[in-house]
Amino acid sequence: MHEQYLPTGNEWVSLPTLQARTGALESFSFLHMGYKGLIEQRGAASLPLMAPFFELDGEKIPLQSLTWARKSDWIPTFHGIAGPLEVEGMLRAPVGERGFLYQLTVRSTLDGPLSGTFGLEGCWASAWHCVNEDKEIDGVRRCYTSLWNDSLIFDMR
């Protein structure tokens, strides 16, 4: 099956591989003048860089029936179902910002309380220098939450 993508981004960051079927983000890239090319962060073949997940009572619930639209003809948004949950998602790379965000909104279709969790999971498998040919960059990769603004930081040294 050929994957359909919904690319987006801004003048700083490119999000070329947002999967229409799953809402998973396979990679993102940015221009690095010191490297004179694009630096691309990629997920693994078995687990993308970022993918929405949903759990109820300790059991994973698949995200299904995604329908997509573009807010302001640019920002990819979706509606989907995960078991008894209605899910809305949006991937935004605001103009002028050197980053992006993946926003999820979840509503229960059931009466009464639910015990569950949702968020993003993934694997930062590799970093690549991309000009005419892609070359993997060696280094130690770390993801952590910024103490300054609680953002997720991708750090490679």
What are these regions (language model features)?
Residues 1-157:
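Terminal accessory carbohydrate-recognition/targeting modules of carbohydrate-active enzymes
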